[in-house]
A protein has these predicted regions:
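A short C-terminal boundary segment appended to hydrolase-like catalytic domains
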Residues: 81-82, 95-99, 333-430, 439, ...
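Short, solvent-exposed loop/turn motifs
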Residues: 222, 385-386, 487, 509
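Short, functionally important structural connectors and interaction interfaces within domains
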Residues: 46, 285, 319, 367, ...
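Acidic, metal/ion-coordinating pockets
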Residues: 3-11, 17-352, 359, 391-403, ...
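Feature captures C-terminal
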Residues: 30-43, 47-69, 192-198, 211-213, ...
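Charged/polar, solvent-exposed surface patches and flexible loops
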Residues: 122, 126-129, 184, 256, ...
Length: 567
């Protein structure tokens, strides 16, 4: 779609009442979305979880993001109409499309793709024009998620971050390139970007591996930015990749650092976090003296921060989505006594609304040029919508499950509940580029094992507890393992061991003592091997060429009627 046609459709949408924001007049169209008057004396720009998406993409937000216990009905566990109502967003317009799955296919065709570093660069420059001292912070998961990032070990994204003007970052998936590669990148390639993580220490003497924080002065305001890497990296990923490092939330150490930077004169303390939003919300109640948490990991695009009270006052907790789809803009008025006021906008990056920054576009073209033929090779065409996000399954994950069962001859298949991965509309070609968007990891091996029904239930219970444990500190983010070929029931309200029931294969109960052939991928054990997942799926795609709409293997969810995290 050409930009002129997009603007025409946008104007028509506004005329029909689908305003860019509540109360917008009919005459306002494209420019209104990014009108952002400056406020205060400190501005923070925030991106997170871009997952190496250099080009604009389609990305469908989840229709299932269940919150339980205290998180039920609270951000970020709101989807669809419940999210719109909570944040006062008018249905049917650009904001509704950006933040929800509602009418996704039609809205995606109307408004076009989102993100892309060339378009993001234009938006960053536009916002910085009225905020010349704004700091751009990257919450991590930037070096992983695409073919070129995997093939260059993140070097393509380091170049893009530097060109974008990122000043500070923390990390998660970056560590899956291995400790040696991360140290090489931080020590030799990343400058002038500062890499900070207070919760990564050596296993032997608990020495800090990276700088825990950085001190800045913006418009005469001394401030500190503390880094919080993903606390469960060695659990969620192969331990051998960072065997000499320990992680964890380490909120007591964090409190010591907050006190330390306050003693050094910081009037504003920011935590650049990759905890996940639920963990950040709990942490904000336990650690005093943090003014702002700019969070990531769980990919929650939340239109407004949550204000959390604690012994030291209040903490703003914000989360800025994923895949380069959003730019968070936080303007603060900081006085001698602390934060006196703030304004926050989570700006969707619509590629049709923002011109591509020429310098960034040239850089991206240079990154892709050596691989272009391989990346753009068409493997199949999809007749249905392909997407990943959702607590239990997505159609692209179903495609991966179907491929695993077919190619490896399995009765049941498991696929990790990753939250990264882009979307494709009906009629789109599935290229190798798109396939790698779903599978580009450093431990892509596929497996075929024999598990008993008892073992299968234990696996599902373990992952389900990670997702639905009522204590956020015992959640690791991500979604439920995707299950192909087998149905089951899930009651998120129960404790571990009692959430999974009624497992069936071909309509018959799964027997606890019988063995079943189970295919999977992404094993975390050292020494694992097997054909990479992208080869398995490519074999399946080439055999089919035209992909019928996927029928999702979904559990029967118990006890969640009326939960606003379930559409």
């Amino acid at each position: 779609m050409q930009r002129r046609e997009f603007l025409r459709l946008l104007a028509l949408a506004a005329a029909a009442g689908a305003s860019l924001r509540p109360g917008a007049s009919e005459a306002e169209a494209a420019e209104e979305l990014y009108e952002l008057p400056a406020f205060g004396n400190v501005s923070l720009l925030h991106i997170t979880d871009t997952h190496a998406q250099l080009l604009p993409v389609y990305f469908r937000e989840p229709d299932v993001n269940i919150g339980i216990a205290a998180a039920a009905g609270q951000p970020p566990h709101l989807v669809g109409e419940a999210l719109l109502k909570h944040f006062g967003i008018a249905p049917g317009g650009t904001q509704a499309h950006a933040f929800t799955f509602l009418d996704f296919e039609a809205a995606a065709r109307r408004y076009g793709k989102v993100g892309g570093f060339a378009h993001l660069a234009s938006l960053v420059k536009r916002v910085r024009a009225s905020r010349p001292h704004a700091l751009l912070l990257d919450g991590g998961d930037s070096w992983q998620g695409s073919a070129t990032s995997l093939w260059t070990q993140g070097a393509d994204m380091i170049g893009a971050q530097k060109l974008l003007g990122v000043e500070v970052m923390t990390a998660h998936w970056e560590f899956t390139y291995g400790a040696q590669r991360v140290q090489q990148a931080v020590g030799k390639e990343l400058a002038p970007i500062e890499f900070i993580a207070q919760n990564v220490k050596t296993v032997d003497f608990e020495d800090p591996v990276f700088k825990p924080y950085t001190l800045k002065n913006v418009n005469g305001v001394p401030l500190a930015i503390i880094g919080q890497a993903f606390p469960y990296t060695p659990i969620a990923h192969p331990r051998y990749m960072m065997s000499e490092w320990s992680f964890g939330i380490q909120d007591k150490h964090l409190q010591q650092l907050v006190d330390e930077v306050r003693a050094k004169g910081a009037k504003l303390v920011v935590l650049l976090s990759h905890n996940g939003m639920d963990v950040d919300l709990k942490l904000a109640t336990r650690v005093r003296g943090i003014d702002v948490i700019l969070g990531g990991h769980t990919h929650d695009g939340v239109p407004a921060p949550t204000v959390v009270g604690n012994a030291g006052g209040q903490t703003l907790v914000a989360n800025a989505g994923s895949n380069g789809k959003f730019l968070g803009v936080l303007d603060l008025e900081v006085k001698t006594g602390g934060v006196a006021g703030y304004r926050y906008r989570l700006l969707p990056v619509f590629a049709n609304l923002l011109p591509a920054d020429p310098e960034m576009a040239r850089y991206i073209d240079g990154v892709r040029a050596p691989h272009r033929a391989k990346l753009e090779e068409k493997l199949a065409v999809t007749e249905g919508l392909l997407y990943r996000r959702g607590n239990f399954n997505g159609t692209f994950d179903q495609l991966i499950l179907d491929a695993l069962m077919t190619v490896k001859g399995a009765e049941i298949a498991f696929s990790p509940g990753f939250r990264w991965g882009t979307s494709l509309l009906p009629g789109d070609a599935v290229t190798r580029d798109h396939l790698m968007d779903q599978t580009a990891i450093t431990y892509p091996y596929t497996t075929l094992n024999e598990f008993t029904g008892e073992q299968i239930k234990a696996i599902l219970e373990d992952v389900c507890d990670n997702l639905f444990n009522p204590d956020p500190y015992l959640q690791q983010g991500g979604d439920m393992v995707r299950v192909g070929g087998m149905t089951y029931a899930c009651d998120p309200r129960q404790k571990i061991g009692a959430r999974i029931s009624d497992m069936r294969l071909g309509g018959k109960p799964v027997a606890a003592n019988r063995t079943y052939k189970v295919a999977g991928w992404a094993p975390v054990a050292e020494g694992a091997s097997g054909e990479p997942i992208w080869s398995i799926v490519e074999t399946y795609l080439r055999a089919h060429r035209t992909l019928a709409p996927r029928r999702l293997d979904l559990p029967r969810v118990i006890g969640m009627q009326g939960n606003p995290g379930l559409a």
